[in-house]
Amino acid sequence: MAKARVYELAKELGVDSKTVLEKLKDMGEFVKSASSTVEAPVVRRLKAAFPKDGGNDSRPSAKKSSTPKSGAPAAAKPAATPAAVAGATPATAAPSAPKPGQRSNTSAKPGAHNTRRNEQTPRPGQNGGQRGATARPHAPGKPGANAGGTRNGGKAAPTPHAPQHGGNRGGSNNAPKPGANAAQHAPRPGNNPFSRKQGMHTPTPGDIPRPHPMARPTVNNNERRGGGNGRPGQRGGFRPRPGQGGSGAPKPGSWGQHRQGAGSGGGRPGGNRFGGGNGGNNFQNNGPSNGPSRGGGRGRGGAAGAFGRQGGKSSKARKNRLAKRHEYEELKAPVIGGVRIPTGNGQTIRLRQGASLADLAEKINVNPAALVTVLFHLGEMATATQSLDESTFQILGEEIGWNIKIVSAEEEDKELLQQFDIDLESEELQEEADLKPRPPVVTVMGHVDHGKTRLLDTIRRTNVVAREAGGITQRIGAYQVTVDLEGEERKITFLDTPGHEAFTAMRARGAELTDIAILVVAADDGVMPQTVEAINHAQSAHVPIVVAVNKIDVPGANPEKVRGQLTEFGLVPEEYGGSTMFVDISAKQGTNVDKLLEAVLLTADAELDLRANPDMDARGATVEARLDKGRGAVATVLVQSGTLHIGDSIVAGTSYGRVRAMLDENGKHMKEALPSTPVQVLGLTSVPTAGDLFLVAPDDRAARQIAEKRQATERAAQLAKRRKVVSLEEFKKKFAESEIDMLNIVIKGDSSGSVEALEGSLMKIEVSDEVGIQVIHRGVGAITQNDVNLASVDKAVIIGFNVRPNRQVADLAEREGVEIKYYSVIYKAIEDIEASLKGMLKPEYEEVTTSHSEIREIFRSSKFGNIAGVMVLDGEVKRGTKARILRDGVTTFNDLEISSLRRFKDDVKSVTEGYEAGINLGNFNDIEIGDVIETFEMREIERK
């Protein structure tokens, strides 16, 4: 015998499957779903226990329906016979509505049941239709005050006291109340398997589940929307039983129940009211009604159609005009590469450097995948998040009708700072009352070995020259001195720039930071290449120049010659009618140095307005930066405006941090740095690049975010530069470059400016098209283990400029075979790298003739073939060398080899001039007497 399933037991017990599942769970039997099987012992226990708990909901109680409680003796009046109801007038057909305090369950007395059967009581088959027409007026005003017994299988049962505020709202006050007879003849639960009602409670309209939109076609559901909703005893939405008339059709003699303005189900008062009438019919309007019914319309209090189409017009049909216009524009958009993209009308779009297709798609409101397809259609392959260069964006913009502009790094950085409420332009516009005088910033420029550092030593009374490697300056030095001008102490900030040609960037940086430039020219050398370069830097920065003609005490000095040479570059002395001040000095002897300082201050007072606001946040530039072993990152900064304090959060390029300490050029601690003051700052997280502007951020968090966003921007820009459009010609060029031998170099230096200068000088070395230099890494600080590992993988050479590794790193480099070269003077490093490049060139060979031998006799051997008896005319014949045959001065055979060389019967390695020998040319036997055997070899020549 098959096991019973849960839904079968529910049908047998007359309850729903959910109730059975809950009961099984209470019994300790956990089943999964209604389709699960149940064991026979559990079935018996369920059937034995269920009538106690579920019988009240599934089986009616005849005793309760026939025996009223003692609290309602007047409740038997509404149980009048239908005949009396039919013969009465509308005003007197039924007693008045019960008062609030009466029970809603008006069961008849014991004798009322027989009386109703004798007076044409409708049969059980007609009970549902009668109840649908007469039960509605009895409904109370509150939704929860249902008539008793309607939830219990249609039988009348006592309910708690429910006051009926508002009386009978249906408009048929004379309709009889439902009696006990209607509940007496209801079918037993579970007898009819095809009935919708299997002993379960009759659901009220609020409990009836909405049908699925696809379950059946749309019907007239006014009984759910209008007055048919919420009335007890009404079975709106259920099909009538067989043998039963239409649910809204009145019985003979009962037309008085259907008043004007009320539907067959006793709808809301007033037939012309929205939603009134047709409470009892399902598919057609059988009852009279004054007002037209709105089939499918939502009545007052009805739901918005959560499960069907009863809720009125669908929200999907209510598309706004903007959405329709957007769809129309998309349909009008041209198809490019198989996708539709709305083209622009030449509008300008600004993108950052290193932007991707996703950034562009966000600007023009399209799908990034569509832009990838269009770019692929144009012959370019890129992902949505890949950084692209400006040329690629321009090609794409021309195709889709947009003018794409890549913003510069300065504009992008300005927009970044504005996000943190930092506006550099507005801070430059200071009020006159806030501006105070500041010292001038003077840069000393000129050719190498013309005495720039010696001049500063004389001014500062120091000896920096003695501490410099090679006697040349290789970094920018910043100093501040106090001079006496007409009894007044004045401060001057000096920047000492290198004069070597490798430090062009440093000189340009010094010219941008300075107020006045001192051009030092040696009286014996005159104008030199770096002198001209310094003049160009100063003039491009619009900086006034004071010329110091140095070394006037050296024999052969000619200051007038220097003045004449400088007039060619626009520097005309005042004595010649110009505006440039010339001072003849001797830095070594200290001659006229005070006059030079006086000229600098006069120029500053006459031509410049040197004022700044010391009360604002500090702004300035990074002059130099290095990595100190004990202090970490140390940056030499020049404060241009504001005051820098200890504890300020600063950002310098991609580096950030908090000022932990400040030192002057002499190593003394400072608490604050005023405008035009050079100071060494400690506390940065990394070494900034020389020339980066620094500023004070509101807090540490803002400083870190600014630095990180700058790092991301630089990284994206670098990735965009690496990706370039490769045409066929460029591909051939790249393929040719792949055959070039590259010298990989790792550069480590003591300061960022020195590393920058060394890298720039090395990249300018040009030896040949066959070799090149590639700097795979550069950094500031000592040589570390990571540098050695990187050089080992890429077979690179490490150059340490004024830095050295520790013992462990040196041992690792020796084990890995990594070469480390140490330099303290930049031009020595350049010379060695240039020599290394020349050594990497492929060797070139030239042919050198070594001897001539004349054949005078031919010996024939069955084992060795023909053997030539020769006389060595010149040079030296060696065994294994290349040879050729000359017959009558014409080369007849080439690429021969002397395989055997004998003198008499002995094998020899070589035979010199004037001796006879026997020569065997291997398998070659076509020789004649009188031929000349010429030997030669390929010798390597030096590449220059």
Curated annotation (Swiss-Prot):
G2, as annotated region: 471-475
Gene Ontology MF terms in the entry: GTP binding; GTPase activity; translation initiation factor activity
Region described as G3: 496-499
Annotated Gene Ontology cellular component terms: cytosol
Binding site for GTP: 446-453, 496-500, 550-553
tr-type G domain: residues covered: 437-609
UniProt-annotated location(s): Cytoplasm
Region (G5), start-end ranges: 586-588
Keyword Nucleotide-binding: yes
Entry keyword set: Cytoplasm, GTP-binding, Initiation factor, Nucleotide-binding, Protein biosynthesis
Disordered: region residues: 48-326
Region annotation (G4) ranges: 550-553
Function of the molecule: One of the essential components for the initiation of protein synthesis. Protects formylmethionyl-tRNA from spontaneous hydrolysis and promotes its binding to the 30S ribosomal subunits. Also involved in the hydrolysis of GTP during the formation of the 70S ribosomal complex.
Protein name listed in UniProt: Translation initiation factor IF-2
